[in-house]
Amino acid sequence: MEPATAPRPDMAPELTPEEEQATKQFLEEINKWTVQYNVSPLSWNVAVKFLMARKFDVLRAVELFHCYRETRRKEGIVKLKPHEEPLRSEILSGKFTILNVRDPTGASIALFTARLHHPHKSVQHVVLQALFYLLDRAVDSFETQRNGLVFIYDMCGSNYANFELDLGKKVLNLLKGAFPARLKKVLIVGAPIWFRVPYSIISLLLKDKVRERIQILKTSEVTQHLPRECLPENLGGYIKIDLATWNFQFLPQVNGHPDPFDEIILFSLPPALDWDSVHVPGPHAMTIQELVDYVNTRQKQGIYEEYEDIRRENPVGTFHCSMSPGNLEKNRYGDVPCLDQTRVKLTKRSGHTQTDYINASFMDGYKQKNAYIGTQGPLENTYRDFWLMVWEQKVLVIVMTTRFEEGGRRKCGQYWPLEKDSRIQFGFLTVTNLGVENMNHYKKTTLEIHNTEERQKRQVTHFQFLSWPDYGVPSSAASLIDFLRVVRSQQSMAVGSLGARSKGQCPEPPIVVHCSAGIGRTGTFCSLDICLAQLEELGTLNVFQTVSRMRTQRAFSIQTPEQYYFCYKAILEFAEREGMVPSGHSLLAMDGQ
Protein backbone atom coordinates (compact mmCIF):
# COMPACT_ATOMS: atom_id res chain seq x y z
CA MET A 1 0.00 0.00 0.00
CA GLU A 2 1.44 3.35 -1.04
CA PRO A 3 1.40 6.18 1.52
CA ALA A 4 -1.08 8.89 0.70
CA THR A 5 0.17 12.46 0.69
CA ALA A 6 -1.87 14.63 3.02
CA PRO A 7 -3.92 17.20 1.10
CA ARG A 8 -3.08 20.84 1.49
CA PRO A 9 -5.66 22.31 3.93
CA ASP A 10 -7.64 25.38 2.92
CA MET A 11 -6.20 27.31 5.89
CA ALA A 12 -2.62 26.15 5.32
CA PRO A 13 0.14 28.80 5.26
CA GLU A 14 1.13 30.26 1.92
CA LEU A 15 4.17 28.51 0.50
CA THR A 16 6.25 28.92 -2.62
CA PRO A 17 5.96 26.17 -5.27
CA GLU A 18 9.38 24.86 -4.18
CA GLU A 19 8.27 24.76 -0.54
CA GLU A 20 5.06 22.93 -1.45
CA GLN A 21 7.07 20.35 -3.38
CA ALA A 22 9.41 19.88 -0.41
CA THR A 23 6.39 19.41 1.86
CA LYS A 24 5.04 16.67 -0.40
CA GLN A 25 8.44 14.93 -0.42
CA PHE A 26 8.68 15.17 3.38
CA LEU A 27 5.21 13.67 3.85
CA GLU A 28 5.94 10.86 1.41
CA GLU A 29 9.09 10.00 3.37
CA ILE A 30 7.50 10.14 6.84
CA ASN A 31 4.29 8.42 5.82
CA LYS A 32 6.10 5.41 4.36
CA TRP A 33 6.39 3.95 7.81
CA THR A 34 3.13 5.40 9.18
CA VAL A 35 1.35 3.25 6.58
CA GLN A 36 3.59 0.25 7.13
CA TYR A 37 3.13 0.26 10.89
CA ASN A 38 -0.48 1.46 11.00
CA VAL A 39 0.28 4.84 12.55
CA SER A 40 -1.86 7.83 11.62
CA PRO A 41 -0.29 9.88 8.81
CA LEU A 42 1.28 13.24 9.51
CA SER A 43 -0.74 16.31 8.58
CA TRP A 44 0.31 18.97 6.08
CA ASN A 45 0.56 21.73 8.71
CA VAL A 46 2.73 19.64 11.03
CA ALA A 47 5.01 18.82 8.10
CA VAL A 48 5.38 22.51 7.30
CA LYS A 49 6.38 23.18 10.92
CA PHE A 50 9.39 20.84 10.65
CA LEU A 51 10.35 22.03 7.19
CA MET A 52 10.23 25.68 8.24
CA ALA A 53 12.68 24.90 11.03
CA ARG A 54 15.17 23.47 8.52
CA LYS A 55 14.55 25.91 5.67
CA PHE A 56 12.73 23.25 3.63
CA ASP A 57 15.73 20.91 3.46
CA VAL A 58 13.79 17.63 3.36
CA LEU A 59 16.56 15.37 4.66
CA ARG A 60 17.33 17.62 7.62
CA ALA A 61 13.62 18.06 8.37
CA VAL A 62 13.14 14.27 8.47
CA GLU A 63 16.08 13.98 10.87
CA LEU A 64 14.61 16.75 13.04
CA PHE A 65 11.22 15.02 13.08
CA HIS A 66 12.68 11.76 14.38
CA CYS A 67 14.90 13.56 16.87
CA TYR A 68 11.88 15.47 18.18
CA ARG A 69 9.86 12.26 18.41
CA GLU A 70 12.66 10.41 20.18
CA THR A 71 13.30 13.27 22.62
CA ARG A 72 9.65 13.41 23.59
CA ARG A 73 9.54 9.64 24.03
CA LYS A 74 12.73 9.55 26.10
CA GLU A 75 11.69 12.42 28.37
CA GLY A 76 8.12 11.17 28.85
CA ILE A 77 6.55 14.12 27.03
CA VAL A 78 3.44 12.32 25.88
CA LYS A 79 -0.29 12.43 26.63
CA LEU A 80 0.05 15.85 28.24
CA LYS A 81 -2.90 17.00 30.35
CA PRO A 82 -2.31 20.69 31.12
CA HIS A 83 -5.38 20.93 33.39
CA GLU A 84 -4.12 18.15 35.67
CA GLU A 85 -1.39 18.14 38.29
CA PRO A 86 1.56 18.34 38.38
CA LEU A 87 1.75 19.79 34.85
CA ARG A 88 -0.83 22.51 35.54
CA SER A 89 1.16 23.96 38.45
CA GLU A 90 4.37 23.82 36.45
CA ILE A 91 2.81 25.73 33.55
CA LEU A 92 1.31 28.31 35.90
CA SER A 93 4.56 28.76 37.86
CA GLY A 94 5.52 31.36 35.28
CA LYS A 95 9.15 30.26 35.20
CA PHE A 96 8.76 29.73 31.46
CA THR A 97 6.42 31.68 29.22
CA ILE A 98 5.86 33.14 25.78
CA LEU A 99 5.51 36.92 25.54
CA ASN A 100 2.60 38.36 23.55
CA VAL A 101 4.88 40.53 21.42
CA ARG A 102 7.40 39.83 18.68
CA ASP A 103 10.83 41.21 17.96
CA PRO A 104 11.26 43.56 14.97
CA THR A 105 11.89 40.59 12.64
CA GLY A 106 8.65 38.88 13.68
CA ALA A 107 10.30 36.28 15.90
CA SER A 108 8.42 35.01 18.94
CA ILE A 109 10.04 35.69 22.35
CA ALA A 110 10.30 32.98 25.01
CA LEU A 111 11.31 33.85 28.58
CA PHE A 112 12.74 31.57 31.28
CA THR A 113 12.96 33.22 34.71
CA ALA A 114 15.64 31.34 36.64
CA ARG A 115 14.80 32.68 40.10
CA LEU A 116 11.42 30.89 39.94
CA HIS A 117 13.00 27.49 39.35
CA HIS A 118 13.61 25.38 42.46
CA PRO A 119 15.14 22.03 41.45
CA HIS A 120 14.50 20.43 44.85
CA LYS A 121 10.77 21.18 44.49
CA SER A 122 10.41 20.30 40.80
CA VAL A 123 10.40 17.06 38.83
CA GLN A 124 12.64 17.58 35.82
CA HIS A 125 10.53 15.73 33.27
CA VAL A 126 7.48 17.78 34.34
CA VAL A 127 9.49 20.98 33.78
CA LEU A 128 10.35 19.70 30.30
CA GLN A 129 6.69 18.81 29.69
CA ALA A 130 5.70 22.40 30.46
CA LEU A 131 8.49 23.73 28.26
CA PHE A 132 7.40 21.54 25.33
CA TYR A 133 3.75 22.42 25.83
CA LEU A 134 4.38 26.17 25.79
CA LEU A 135 6.86 26.05 22.92
CA ASP A 136 4.36 24.02 20.91
CA ARG A 137 1.79 26.74 21.51
CA ALA A 138 4.26 29.29 20.15
CA VAL A 139 5.16 27.39 16.97
CA ASP A 140 1.52 26.72 16.17
CA SER A 141 1.76 30.20 14.69
CA PHE A 142 2.88 30.31 11.07
CA GLU A 143 4.54 33.66 11.81
CA THR A 144 6.73 32.02 14.46
CA GLN A 145 7.52 29.12 12.15
CA ARG A 146 8.67 31.53 9.46
CA ASN A 147 10.45 34.12 11.62
CA GLY A 148 11.86 32.00 14.43
CA LEU A 149 12.29 32.20 18.17
CA VAL A 150 14.30 34.39 20.55
CA PHE A 151 15.03 32.75 23.91
CA ILE A 152 15.74 34.91 26.98
CA TYR A 153 17.28 33.20 30.01
CA ASP A 154 16.71 35.72 32.81
CA MET A 155 19.14 35.00 35.68
CA CYS A 156 18.54 38.28 37.49
CA GLY A 157 18.05 37.72 41.21
CA SER A 158 18.81 34.00 40.97
CA ASN A 159 21.45 32.06 42.86
CA TYR A 160 23.16 28.70 42.52
CA ALA A 161 20.23 26.90 44.18
CA ASN A 162 18.05 27.93 41.21
CA PHE A 163 20.42 26.42 38.66
CA GLU A 164 20.23 22.86 37.30
CA LEU A 165 23.05 21.95 34.92
CA ASP A 166 21.41 18.83 33.51
CA LEU A 167 18.19 20.72 32.78
CA GLY A 168 20.18 23.50 31.12
CA LYS A 169 21.88 21.01 28.81
CA LYS A 170 18.59 19.37 27.92
CA VAL A 171 16.92 22.67 27.12
CA LEU A 172 19.87 23.73 24.97
CA ASN A 173 19.91 20.41 23.12
CA LEU A 174 16.18 20.73 22.59
CA LEU A 175 16.40 24.23 21.16
CA LYS A 176 19.34 23.57 18.87
CA GLY A 177 18.48 20.18 17.46
CA ALA A 178 15.25 18.59 18.64
CA PHE A 179 12.48 21.16 18.33
CA PRO A 180 10.78 22.49 15.16
CA ALA A 181 11.67 26.15 15.52
CA ARG A 182 14.34 28.42 14.06
CA LEU A 183 16.42 29.56 17.00
CA LYS A 184 17.39 33.16 16.21
CA LYS A 185 19.34 33.96 19.38
CA VAL A 186 19.69 33.21 23.08
CA LEU A 187 20.11 36.11 25.51
CA ILE A 188 21.47 35.15 28.94
CA VAL A 189 20.78 38.13 31.18
CA GLY A 190 22.27 38.96 34.58
CA ALA A 191 24.43 35.84 34.85
CA PRO A 192 26.33 35.60 38.18
CA ILE A 193 30.09 35.00 38.18
CA TRP A 194 29.68 31.33 39.14
CA PHE A 195 27.74 30.71 35.91
CA ARG A 196 30.97 30.78 33.88
CA VAL A 197 31.94 27.25 34.91
CA PRO A 198 28.68 25.46 34.02
CA TYR A 199 28.39 27.53 30.85
CA SER A 200 31.86 26.42 29.76
CA ILE A 201 30.68 22.82 30.13
CA ILE A 202 27.50 23.45 28.17
CA SER A 203 29.37 25.37 25.46
CA LEU A 204 31.35 22.22 24.62
CA LEU A 205 28.16 21.00 22.97
CA LEU A 206 27.89 23.99 20.70
CA LYS A 207 28.99 24.48 17.14
CA ASP A 208 30.26 27.92 16.17
CA LYS A 209 26.97 28.68 14.42
CA VAL A 210 25.01 28.23 17.66
CA ARG A 211 27.64 29.75 19.94
CA GLU A 212 27.55 32.94 17.88
CA ARG A 213 23.83 33.28 18.63
CA ILE A 214 24.32 33.25 22.41
CA GLN A 215 24.90 36.57 24.15
CA ILE A 216 25.68 36.90 27.86
CA LEU A 217 24.44 40.36 28.84
CA LYS A 218 24.13 42.69 31.76
CA THR A 219 20.58 43.83 32.44
CA SER A 220 21.46 47.29 31.16
CA GLU A 221 22.58 45.84 27.81
CA VAL A 222 19.40 43.96 26.87
CA THR A 223 17.82 46.97 25.16
CA GLN A 224 20.74 47.01 22.72
CA HIS A 225 19.45 43.68 21.38
CA LEU A 226 15.68 44.04 21.72
CA PRO A 227 13.54 47.21 21.82
CA ARG A 228 11.85 48.09 25.11
CA GLU A 229 8.46 47.30 23.58
CA CYS A 230 9.54 43.64 23.45
CA LEU A 231 10.81 43.34 27.03
CA PRO A 232 9.23 42.98 30.49
CA GLU A 233 9.71 45.82 32.96
CA ASN A 234 12.35 44.04 35.04
CA LEU A 235 14.59 43.84 31.95
CA GLY A 236 14.19 47.51 31.12
CA GLY A 237 11.12 47.16 28.92
CA TYR A 238 7.54 48.37 28.88
CA ILE A 239 5.63 45.07 29.20
CA LYS A 240 3.75 44.69 32.45
CA ILE A 241 3.66 41.00 33.23
CA ASP A 242 2.48 39.11 36.30
CA LEU A 243 4.27 35.78 36.03
CA ALA A 244 1.92 34.24 38.57
CA THR A 245 -1.10 34.65 36.27
CA TRP A 246 0.33 35.19 32.77
CA ASN A 247 0.24 31.56 31.65
CA PHE A 248 -3.47 31.08 32.34
CA GLN A 249 -4.01 32.28 28.77
CA PHE A 250 -2.15 29.23 27.43
CA LEU A 251 -4.36 26.66 29.16
CA PRO A 252 -7.04 25.19 26.90
CA GLN A 253 -10.69 25.40 27.89
CA VAL A 254 -10.62 21.64 28.47
CA ASN A 255 -7.83 19.10 28.26
CA GLY A 256 -8.45 19.28 24.55
CA HIS A 257 -8.22 16.87 21.68
CA PRO A 258 -5.59 14.11 21.82
CA ASP A 259 -2.20 15.23 20.58
CA PRO A 260 -1.72 13.53 17.17
CA PHE A 261 1.94 13.10 18.09
CA ASP A 262 1.11 10.80 21.01
CA GLU A 263 0.53 7.85 18.70
CA ILE A 264 3.70 8.59 16.74
CA ILE A 265 5.81 9.07 19.88
CA LEU A 266 4.59 5.89 21.53
CA PHE A 267 5.25 3.95 18.37
CA SER A 268 8.74 2.41 18.52
CA LEU A 269 10.50 2.57 15.21
CA PRO A 270 12.09 -0.82 14.43
CA PRO A 271 15.85 -0.74 15.08
CA ALA A 272 16.79 -2.03 11.65
CA LEU A 273 16.10 0.09 8.58
CA ASP A 274 15.90 -1.22 5.04
CA TRP A 275 19.53 -1.63 4.05
CA ASP A 276 18.78 -0.53 0.50
CA SER A 277 17.98 2.96 1.83
CA VAL A 278 21.25 3.37 3.74
CA HIS A 279 23.86 5.69 2.19
CA VAL A 280 22.48 5.29 -1.32
CA PRO A 281 23.26 8.41 -3.38
CA GLY A 282 20.25 10.69 -3.65
CA PRO A 283 18.92 12.60 -6.65
CA HIS A 284 22.00 14.86 -6.69
CA ALA A 285 24.47 11.98 -7.18
CA MET A 286 27.23 12.51 -9.74
CA THR A 287 28.89 10.27 -12.28
CA ILE A 288 32.67 10.24 -12.10
CA GLN A 289 32.95 12.63 -15.06
CA GLU A 290 30.43 14.96 -13.44
CA LEU A 291 32.55 14.82 -10.28
CA VAL A 292 35.67 15.76 -12.25
CA ASP A 293 33.83 18.71 -13.81
CA TYR A 294 32.36 19.69 -10.44
CA VAL A 295 35.76 19.76 -8.71
CA ASN A 296 37.34 21.67 -11.58
CA THR A 297 34.53 24.22 -11.40
CA ARG A 298 34.44 24.62 -7.62
CA GLN A 299 38.20 24.25 -7.20
CA LYS A 300 39.82 23.69 -3.83
CA GLN A 301 38.40 26.83 -2.23
CA GLY A 302 34.90 25.93 -3.37
CA ILE A 303 35.17 22.44 -1.84
CA TYR A 304 36.43 24.03 1.38
CA GLU A 305 33.36 26.29 1.39
CA GLU A 306 31.15 23.26 0.81
CA TYR A 307 32.66 21.67 3.91
CA GLU A 308 31.94 24.83 5.90
CA ASP A 309 28.26 24.47 4.96
CA ILE A 310 28.34 21.01 6.53
CA ARG A 311 30.37 22.05 9.56
CA ARG A 312 28.04 24.93 10.43
CA GLU A 313 25.07 22.60 10.86
CA ASN A 314 24.23 21.72 14.45
CA PRO A 315 24.51 18.07 15.47
CA VAL A 316 21.15 16.33 15.25
CA GLY A 317 20.56 14.74 18.63
CA THR A 318 21.68 14.98 22.23
CA PHE A 319 24.84 14.26 24.23
CA HIS A 320 23.41 13.65 27.70
CA CYS A 321 25.31 10.43 28.42
CA SER A 322 28.68 11.74 27.18
CA MET A 323 28.35 14.87 29.30
CA SER A 324 27.18 13.06 32.43
CA PRO A 325 29.71 13.85 35.21
CA GLY A 326 30.43 10.16 35.76
CA ASN A 327 31.35 9.66 32.11
CA LEU A 328 33.45 12.76 31.37
CA GLU A 329 36.69 10.98 32.26
CA LYS A 330 35.92 8.38 29.59
CA ASN A 331 36.10 10.99 26.82
CA ARG A 332 39.56 11.52 25.34
CA TYR A 333 38.59 15.06 24.32
CA GLY A 334 36.03 17.19 26.13
CA ASP A 335 34.77 18.73 22.89
CA VAL A 336 34.13 15.39 21.14
CA PRO A 337 31.03 13.96 22.82
CA CYS A 338 29.03 11.02 21.55
CA LEU A 339 25.43 11.23 20.32
CA ASP A 340 22.92 9.50 22.58
CA GLN A 341 20.86 8.31 19.62
CA THR A 342 23.63 6.23 18.00
CA ARG A 343 26.00 5.41 20.85
CA VAL A 344 27.11 1.84 21.45
CA LYS A 345 25.77 0.63 24.79
CA LEU A 346 27.77 -1.84 26.86
CA THR A 347 26.02 -4.55 28.82
CA LYS A 348 25.97 -3.76 32.53
CA ARG A 349 27.19 -6.72 34.54
CA SER A 350 26.28 -7.63 38.09
CA GLY A 351 29.08 -6.99 40.53
CA HIS A 352 30.67 -4.32 38.34
CA THR A 353 30.40 -0.55 38.80
CA GLN A 354 30.89 0.32 35.13
CA THR A 355 28.20 2.25 33.25
CA ASP A 356 27.02 1.27 29.79
CA TYR A 357 28.93 4.21 28.27
CA ILE A 358 31.79 4.20 25.81
CA ASN A 359 32.58 7.02 23.38
CA ALA A 360 31.64 5.00 20.32
CA SER A 361 28.93 5.37 17.68
CA PHE A 362 27.20 3.06 15.23
CA MET A 363 27.61 4.34 11.68
CA ASP A 364 25.87 3.14 8.54
CA GLY A 365 27.75 2.03 5.45
CA TYR A 366 26.66 1.58 1.86
CA LYS A 367 23.52 -0.58 1.97
CA GLN A 368 24.44 -1.76 5.45
CA LYS A 369 23.03 -0.60 8.76
CA ASN A 370 25.69 -0.23 11.49
CA ALA A 371 28.54 -1.10 9.13
CA TYR A 372 31.07 0.64 11.37
CA ILE A 373 31.64 1.60 14.95
CA GLY A 374 33.45 4.94 15.01
CA THR A 375 35.26 5.43 18.29
CA GLN A 376 38.06 7.35 19.97
CA GLY A 377 41.54 5.98 20.58
CA PRO A 378 41.15 4.01 23.84
CA LEU A 379 42.33 5.55 27.10
CA GLU A 380 43.90 3.43 29.82
CA ASN A 381 40.70 3.69 31.85
CA THR A 382 38.61 2.51 28.87
CA TYR A 383 40.69 -0.45 27.59
CA ARG A 384 38.36 -2.90 29.30
CA ASP A 385 35.28 -1.13 27.92
CA PHE A 386 36.78 -1.19 24.43
CA TRP A 387 37.36 -4.95 24.44
CA LEU A 388 33.96 -5.57 25.99
CA MET A 389 32.43 -3.64 23.09
CA VAL A 390 34.46 -5.65 20.57
CA TRP A 391 33.25 -8.89 22.16
CA GLU A 392 29.60 -7.92 22.53
CA GLN A 393 29.32 -6.54 18.98
CA LYS A 394 31.07 -9.64 17.57
CA VAL A 395 33.67 -7.45 15.85
CA LEU A 396 36.04 -9.23 13.45
CA VAL A 397 38.19 -6.31 12.24
CA ILE A 398 39.64 -3.26 14.01
CA VAL A 399 41.10 -0.36 11.99
CA MET A 400 43.46 2.12 13.67
CA THR A 401 44.50 5.17 11.65
CA THR A 402 46.88 6.85 14.11
CA ARG A 403 50.12 6.14 15.95
CA PHE A 404 50.45 6.10 19.73
CA GLU A 405 52.15 9.50 19.58
CA GLU A 406 52.18 12.14 16.85
CA GLY A 407 53.77 15.55 16.94
CA GLY A 408 54.96 14.87 20.48
CA ARG A 409 51.41 14.28 21.75
CA ARG A 410 49.76 11.11 22.99
CA LYS A 411 47.05 10.09 20.53
CA CYS A 412 46.06 6.61 21.64
CA GLY A 413 46.83 4.11 24.37
CA GLN A 414 48.47 0.73 23.77
CA TYR A 415 45.34 -1.32 24.25
CA TRP A 416 46.53 -4.61 22.69
CA PRO A 417 49.62 -6.82 23.17
CA LEU A 418 52.28 -5.83 20.61
CA GLU A 419 54.53 -8.89 20.58
CA LYS A 420 53.65 -12.37 19.35
CA ASP A 421 52.48 -14.72 22.13
CA SER A 422 52.13 -11.85 24.61
CA ARG A 423 48.77 -11.32 26.29
CA ILE A 424 46.90 -8.76 28.34
CA GLN A 425 43.93 -9.42 30.60
CA PHE A 426 41.00 -7.02 30.73
CA GLY A 427 38.65 -8.34 33.40
CA PHE A 428 37.19 -11.62 32.13
CA LEU A 429 38.58 -11.02 28.62
CA THR A 430 42.14 -12.06 27.77
CA VAL A 431 43.65 -10.75 24.53
CA THR A 432 46.55 -12.73 23.03
CA ASN A 433 48.79 -11.74 20.11
CA LEU A 434 48.92 -14.66 17.64
CA GLY A 435 51.18 -12.96 15.12
CA VAL A 436 52.24 -9.68 13.47
CA GLU A 437 52.80 -8.86 9.79
CA ASN A 438 54.64 -5.62 8.93
CA MET A 439 53.69 -4.18 5.55
CA ASN A 440 54.86 -1.02 3.77
CA HIS A 441 52.02 1.18 4.94
CA TYR A 442 50.34 -0.77 7.69
CA LYS A 443 50.74 -3.41 10.36
CA LYS A 444 48.44 -6.42 10.63
CA THR A 445 48.07 -8.21 13.96
CA THR A 446 46.01 -11.33 14.57
CA LEU A 447 44.50 -11.34 18.05
CA GLU A 448 42.57 -13.91 20.03
CA ILE A 449 39.99 -12.89 22.62
CA HIS A 450 39.25 -15.44 25.33
CA ASN A 451 36.08 -14.88 27.34
CA THR A 452 36.77 -16.75 30.57
CA GLU A 453 33.17 -16.36 31.77
CA GLU A 454 31.60 -17.88 28.66
CA ARG A 455 34.62 -20.11 27.87
CA GLN A 456 34.65 -18.96 24.26
CA LYS A 457 37.42 -17.72 21.97
CA ARG A 458 37.33 -15.52 18.88
CA GLN A 459 39.89 -14.14 16.47
CA VAL A 460 40.05 -10.46 15.60
CA THR A 461 42.31 -8.83 13.01
CA HIS A 462 43.85 -5.51 14.01
CA PHE A 463 45.09 -3.16 11.28
CA GLN A 464 47.19 -0.07 12.02
CA PHE A 465 47.61 2.33 9.09
CA LEU A 466 51.04 3.97 9.33
CA SER A 467 51.18 6.34 6.36
CA TRP A 468 49.02 9.17 7.60
CA PRO A 469 51.28 12.16 8.31
CA ASP A 470 51.33 13.75 11.78
CA TYR A 471 49.79 16.89 10.31
CA GLY A 472 47.40 17.30 7.39
CA VAL A 473 46.50 14.51 4.99
CA PRO A 474 48.49 12.12 2.76
CA SER A 475 49.86 13.68 -0.43
CA SER A 476 48.52 10.69 -2.34
CA ALA A 477 45.56 8.45 -1.56
CA ALA A 478 47.14 5.37 -3.15
CA SER A 479 48.31 3.74 0.08
CA LEU A 480 44.99 4.42 1.83
CA ILE A 481 42.99 2.99 -1.09
CA ASP A 482 45.15 -0.15 -1.03
CA PHE A 483 44.74 -0.37 2.74
CA LEU A 484 40.98 -0.01 2.47
CA ARG A 485 40.85 -2.92 0.01
CA VAL A 486 42.89 -5.09 2.39
CA VAL A 487 40.53 -4.26 5.25
CA ARG A 488 37.47 -5.04 3.12
CA SER A 489 39.00 -8.34 1.97
CA GLN A 490 39.78 -9.38 5.54
CA GLN A 491 36.26 -8.50 6.69
CA SER A 492 34.75 -10.57 3.86
CA MET A 493 36.95 -13.58 4.63
CA ALA A 494 36.21 -13.35 8.35
CA VAL A 495 32.47 -13.11 7.75
CA GLY A 496 32.67 -16.02 5.30
CA SER A 497 34.35 -18.17 7.93
CA LEU A 498 31.33 -17.70 10.17
CA GLY A 499 29.19 -19.71 7.74
CA ALA A 500 26.19 -18.86 5.61
CA ARG A 501 23.68 -16.40 6.97
CA SER A 502 20.01 -16.49 6.13
CA LYS A 503 18.64 -13.80 3.88
CA GLY A 504 17.24 -10.84 5.78
CA GLN A 505 19.84 -10.80 8.53
CA CYS A 506 22.49 -8.12 8.88
CA PRO A 507 25.22 -9.44 6.54
CA GLU A 508 28.14 -8.78 8.85
CA PRO A 509 29.19 -7.32 12.19
CA PRO A 510 30.58 -3.78 12.29
CA ILE A 511 34.18 -2.84 11.62
CA VAL A 512 35.62 -0.80 14.49
CA VAL A 513 37.40 2.29 13.14
CA HIS A 514 39.31 4.73 15.32
CA CYS A 515 41.94 7.42 15.21
CA SER A 516 42.51 9.66 18.23
CA ALA A 517 39.24 11.56 18.58
CA GLY A 518 37.38 9.12 16.36
CA ILE A 519 36.00 11.72 13.97
CA GLY A 520 38.73 13.08 11.64
CA ARG A 521 40.61 10.23 10.01
CA THR A 522 37.85 7.86 11.10
CA GLY A 523 35.25 9.90 9.22
CA THR A 524 37.56 10.20 6.21
CA PHE A 525 38.17 6.44 6.08
CA CYS A 526 34.46 5.58 6.34
CA SER A 527 33.37 8.28 3.87
CA LEU A 528 35.86 7.04 1.30
CA ASP A 529 34.75 3.43 1.82
CA ILE A 530 31.09 4.39 1.30
CA CYS A 531 31.69 6.60 -1.73
CA LEU A 532 33.88 4.04 -3.50
CA ALA A 533 31.24 1.37 -2.87
CA GLN A 534 28.61 3.69 -4.37
CA LEU A 535 30.80 4.36 -7.38
CA GLU A 536 31.69 0.72 -8.04
CA GLU A 537 28.11 -0.57 -7.83
CA LEU A 538 26.04 2.33 -9.17
CA GLY A 539 28.51 4.41 -11.16
CA THR A 540 27.44 7.49 -9.17
CA LEU A 541 28.25 8.93 -5.75
CA ASN A 542 27.45 11.85 -3.46
CA VAL A 543 30.24 13.04 -1.15
CA PHE A 544 28.29 15.92 0.39
CA GLN A 545 25.31 13.73 1.31
CA THR A 546 27.53 10.93 2.62
CA VAL A 547 29.42 13.18 5.01
CA SER A 548 26.28 15.07 6.08
CA ARG A 549 24.48 11.84 6.95
CA MET A 550 27.53 10.41 8.68
CA ARG A 551 27.67 13.41 11.00
CA THR A 552 24.11 12.64 12.15
CA GLN A 553 25.48 9.36 13.56
CA ARG A 554 29.05 10.18 14.59
CA ALA A 555 28.88 13.91 15.32
CA PHE A 556 31.63 16.13 13.86
CA SER A 557 32.92 13.38 11.51
CA ILE A 558 35.62 14.78 9.21
CA GLN A 559 37.23 17.53 11.24
CA THR A 560 38.84 19.75 8.63
CA PRO A 561 38.18 21.06 5.11
CA GLU A 562 41.50 19.46 4.14
CA GLN A 563 40.15 16.01 5.05
CA TYR A 564 36.93 16.70 3.13
CA TYR A 565 38.87 17.80 0.04
CA PHE A 566 41.06 14.71 0.40
CA CYS A 567 37.93 12.55 -0.01
CA TYR A 568 37.29 14.11 -3.41
CA LYS A 569 40.93 13.75 -4.38
CA ALA A 570 41.05 10.10 -3.27
CA ILE A 571 37.94 9.24 -5.29
CA LEU A 572 39.41 10.78 -8.44
CA GLU A 573 42.72 9.02 -7.82
CA PHE A 574 40.85 5.73 -7.50
CA ALA A 575 38.89 6.46 -10.69
CA GLU A 576 42.12 7.03 -12.64
CA ARG A 577 43.63 3.80 -11.36
CA GLU A 578 40.50 1.92 -12.43
CA GLY A 579 40.41 3.55 -15.86
CA MET A 580 37.15 5.41 -15.21
CA VAL A 581 38.69 8.72 -16.32
CA PRO A 582 41.71 9.45 -18.54
CA SER A 583 45.00 9.08 -16.70
CA GLY A 584 46.37 12.33 -15.29
CA HIS A 585 43.39 14.42 -16.38
CA SER A 586 41.58 14.89 -13.09
CA LEU A 587 44.61 14.88 -10.81
CA LEU A 588 46.43 17.47 -12.87
CA ALA A 589 43.41 19.71 -12.50
CA MET A 590 43.35 19.22 -8.75
CA ASP A 591 47.09 19.53 -8.26
CA GLY A 592 46.98 22.91 -9.94
CA GLN A 593 44.55 24.29 -7.39
From Swiss-Prot:
Name the UniProt record assigns to this protein: Tyrosine-protein phosphatase non-receptor type 9
Top enzyme class: hydrolase
Binding-site residues for substrate, renumbered to this chain: D470, C515, S516, A517, G518, I519, G520, R521, Q559
Role played: Protein-tyrosine phosphatase that could participate in the transfer of hydrophobic ligands or in functions of the Golgi apparatus.
Biological process, per Gene Ontology: negative regulation of neuron projection development; positive regulation of protein localization to plasma membrane; signal transduction
Residues covered by the CRAL-TRIO domain: 84-243
Protein encoded by which gene: Ptpn9
GO molecular function: protein tyrosine phosphatase activity
Catalytic activity from the UniProt record: O-phospho-L-tyrosyl-[protein] + H2O = L-tyrosyl-[protein] + phosphate
Subcellular location: Cytoplasm
Family the entry assigns: Belongs to the protein-tyrosine phosphatase family. Non-receptor class 3 subfamily.
Sequence segments annotated as region (Disordered): 1-21
Assigned keywords, A-Z: Acetylation, Cytoplasm, Hydrolase, Protein phosphatase
Biological source species: Rattus norvegicus (Rat)
InterPro entries found in the cross-reference section: CRAL-TRIO_dom (IPR001251), CRAL-TRIO_dom_sf (IPR036865), CRAL/TRIO_N_dom_sf (IPR036273), Prot-tyrosine_phosphatase-like (IPR029021), Protein-Tyr_Phosphatase (IPR050348), PTP_cat (IPR000242), Tyr_Pase_AS (IPR016130), Tyr_Pase_cat (IPR003595)
EC numbers on record: 3.1.3.48
UniProt cross-references to CDD domains, sorted A to Z: PTPc-N9, SEC14
Residues making up the signal peptide according to the UniProt record: none
